[in-house]
Amino acid sequence: MSNPLLHIEGLPPFSQIKPEHIQPAIQELIEENRQVIEQVLKQPHFTWENFIEPLSEAGEHLSRAWSPISHLNSVKNSPELRDAYQACLPLLSEYSTWVGQHRGLYNAYLALKNSPEFATYSVAQKKAIENALRDFELSGIGLSEEKQKRYGEIVARLSELSAQFSNNVLDATMGWEKVIEDESQLAGLPESALLAAKQSAESKGLKGYRFTLEIPSYLPIMTYCENAALREEMYHAYATRASDQGPNAGKWDNTAIIEEIMTLRVELAKLLGFNTYTERSLATKMAENPQQVLDFLNNLADRSKAQGEKELAELKAYCEKEFGVTELAPWDISFYSEKQKQHLYAINDEELRPYFPEDRVISGLFELIKRIFNIRAVERFGVDTWHKDVRFFDLIDETDEVRGSFYLDLYARENKRGGAWMDDCIGRKRNADGSIQKPVAYLTCNFNAPIGDKPALFTHDEVTTLFHEFGHGIHHMLTKVDVPDVAGINGVPWDAVELPSQFMENWCWEKEALDFISGHFETHEPLPEEKLNQLLKAKNYQAAMFVLRQLEFGLFDFTLHHTFEAGKANQVLDTLKAVKDKVAVIKGVEWARTPHSSSHIFAGGYAAGYYSYLWAEVLSADAFSRFEEEGIFNPVTGKSFLDEILTRGGSEEPMVLFKRFRGREPQLDALLRHKGIAN
């Protein structure tokens, strides 16, 4: 039986991939890579062509197989697939440690760096070699054999733990449901949420309305449902997912997993000669040292706190006056905030949905990139995908060259991980014959699917999410760097990687852009002037409270990784409490366990890096302010952003690229102005 994962040419053959193909393919490809490495190292001297290129080619075979496997694990999870995926994690971890500690490889890279030929390399080639040498150091190349062995054990165990953490969050999210037959208990809920809940119940052969902890089901209850007891019940279930508390206490508990992850991260950092895990994290980031990050977060907290307190005081005063409510619990905040927002601005998310049908939003997004970057998006049909709802598009430039392509998977489904993300399917590289391999991305969201004969209708918030992920997508797809390790998002420091994504969100708040991004699904009329003005006025409603919530995550993550000591009790919840006392205006509840479902921090790339969202937002707000000065559709400014930032991938330091685009270092003012925080 031939294995579809071996030596994939072109796009992944999704319909042919079965769980039983996975482990044999990965084992074979790892072995092939090991052989190629040993083979090239036998040469008397090393050049780019005889050393880097064959390694890159073999590495490509492995990543082309692993990318669809990893993607399917996120979008079409099943017990068989999950087992096959997890069986590969230790193999990949062991292989990557073997590479990272391979003295012969390290010496070969060093020889290239010190060769006369190095001076003739392109900026991207030099950067790829320098990054590789740095990564050898971070993989313990300089350690004794015993310490190297321990490093390998830690990395393998961490990869296992983060997969277990994710599985627990997914299982806990899917492991709770609430079925309600009496519609009177759902007063206030918008029609779209009722229809979705009814459809969900029918799909399970149940009567009434079925609610789950998936965001499209959970958020409408928290925002609109008059039934406070139901809001509390759902909040309780959501805030205690995968923990020792709540309705499924102890069932998918991440408590011990977090402890072990933190203990191992600290050990790893110390093994490599760092004082803290934050220092290890920043070794590959734009920020220079932990103090700089803490100062940045604390400075932003100081500037936002008073306004956040004022926003909460205004909400409380409104609740007391209008509803006689004097105490606000956490499950009341979204509900009463929505009421106050409607009172102040006569607008709600649900009213806007009919103006953001899927086809209009997608065509508006494509119109925008045509105007600013002169890039066309064209749908391609007949592509093999993992679900019938998935679409595929090519991005084409003014010379009619296909620059990149992407899969678009917009709707929430069972066995699909929550949230929204962009991931790379294929990276750009120059092939041995001189041809260019074009990049391909996965763009994944979790929006409500079309119901009945209505198209999918998005909230404005969801529109912003789509633009955000598309920003990551164009960073990957429009790169002109041909060296895989620094092409697209590869090699981009984590605290700069959110620059293009947050940058793209800005147009969702511009009248001239909303004129073609919005259009009523029945009449095709764009968003009426009065609704548009209300939307823009409401943009900064509770802006400081929102920034403070981001700071709470950022400071919790960074402080925990900066101060964690193995064996000391209760550090996770104590750190969270200390951070909340400092920055939060909304008091938490004793039983809430947000860290236990914080996949970004414990199962994603944001360990001691969650601050990156706000850090990059300073860059993106300031970058957009150049468009505000020169015209938001100015093609010259657009070309400058494309040429100086998007096409360059990770080939140069982000600060160098930013200064080239902006003409100076980034300033905090634009962010505060965009957020409506008094400067």
What function would you assign to each model-found segment?
Residues M1-H21, E28, F46, G188, ...:
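C-terminal, non-catalytic "cap/extension" segments appended to globular domains
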Residues M1-N33, S74-N77, L81-E288, R303, ...:
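His/Asp/Glu-rich acidic catalytic environments and adjacent acidic regulatory segments
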Residues F14-I26, T47-I52, G250-N254, V293-L297, ...:
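Membrane-entry segments of alpha-helical transmembrane domains in multi-pass membrane proteins
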Residues I30-T120, Q550-L560, F564-D581, V585-G588, ...:
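C-terminal non-catalytic alpha-helical accessory regions
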Residues N50, Y85-L89, D253, F296-L300, ...:
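Membrane-interfacial loop-to-helix junctions in multi-pass inner-membrane proteins
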Residues E60-H71, R134, H236, I333-K341, ...:
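Short, hydrophobic/amphipathic alpha-helical patches that form generic packing surfaces
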Residues A124, A128-E130, R157-E160, N167, ...:
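Active-site-proximal, well-structured secondary-structure segments within enzyme catalytic domains
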Residues N448-F467:
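Short pre-active-site segment immediately N-terminal to the catalytic Zn-binding motif
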